[in-house]
Amino acid sequence: MKLFTISILSLALGYNGIAQNSGKSNSINTLKNEVEKNIQTNYDGYKKIALNIWDYAEVGFKETKSSLLLQNTLKENGFKVDAGVAGMPTAFVATYGSGSPVVAILAEFDALPGLSQETSFVKTPIANRNSGHGCGHNLFGTGSVAAGIAIKKLIEEGKVKGTVKVFGTPAEEGGDGKVYMVREGLFNDVDVALHWHPDQHNTVTYTSSLAIKTAKFRFYGISAHASAAPDKGRSALDAVEAMDY
């Protein structure tokens, strides 16, 4: 779980670097130590949240328990939470602070179908369960919430200024929950958005990636007798296979 902690620190310190006034603020090292202390103090609680979301293993747009757990954690730590935003029951925006900069931290928490798994290094599907966390989104959502809470404490103590928002973004795995949130204008006042993802190493990625466009294609064939009149028919399957190339 060490990299998990480092990733939370990276998110929180990213905010601090944005929010600081270089001439009048605390040193970044002092803030880093305070953030790390806050995270370590609450580490066992965050670990429990991450394991609970792992066990819930809820697929996109159905992450009811996972979303509620993160929302309640933020509420308990002084955030104002708007739930069910952009027409999605499991989406939320949690806000603390006022004024600029407005920094968003994105939290994902959806699982994937067909990836049921015990917390083991070998493939061990859970009996009678289909979905599971193949991309570590149980850590993703928890880490983002932990970073938001650490930042909130610094704002509360007057050590940094601005507003921190934790965006609960459902259905990253193919459902495009963030798209609907953007369409509803929920990011209009945001100066910068911070995002992370569990991985086997800790790094900053500067690369971009391709977008996803969901579409449906229908292929129509012409029926014919396969033996008596094969030349009269057209196979829809041939067109499907041709599209693979």
Identify the residue ranges that each predicted region occupies:
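Bacterial Sec-dependent N-terminal signal peptides
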Residues: 1-24
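Histidine/acidic-residue-rich, glycine-tolerant segments that coordinate divalent metal ions
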Residues: 123-132, 138-139, 155-245
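Acidic/His- and Gly-rich active-site-bordering loop/insert found
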Residues: 20-133, 142-162
